[in-house]
């Protein structure tokens, strides 16, 4: 799970608990101008064969955390419960997308959109 905070001109995604270990990342700070879109994606698929794990942990259809190469893009995942997933599309960043589980998707989207 990830918590979302907004500073003046950036959004901080802080990875919680053991997911820091599984994802090999504790936080990401993204400038607001690099965020192209943000939307809820409940019940997103976590198929085993749709990506290549670059650095992270994955149990097919159960848990995915870390950096994955998927559909010709580098994507950061941190998802256990697919019901609370949001997707953040980015430009000018290492990651093309962040696919993360949050406590409250509507609230997280509102924070990101400012």
Label for each model-derived stretch:
Residues 12-30:
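Short aromatic-glycine motifs in intrinsically disordered, low-complexity regions
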Residues 1-9:
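Polybasic, low-complexity association/targeting segments
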């Amino acid at each position: 799970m990830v918590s979302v905070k907004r500073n003046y001109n950036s959004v901080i995604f802080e990875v919680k608990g053991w997911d820091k270990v599984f994802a090999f990342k504790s936080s990401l700070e993204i400038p607001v101008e690099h965020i192209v879109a943000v939307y809820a994606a409940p019940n997103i698929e976590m198929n085993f064969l749709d990506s290549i794990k670059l650095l992270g942990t994955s149990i097919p259809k159960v848990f995915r955390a870390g950096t994955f190469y998927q559909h010709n893009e580098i994507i950061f995942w941190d998802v256990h419960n697919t019901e609370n997933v949001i997707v953040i599309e980015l430009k000018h960043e290492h990651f093309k997308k962040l696919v993360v589980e949050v406590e409250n998707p509507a609230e997280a989207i509102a924070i990101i959109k400012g």
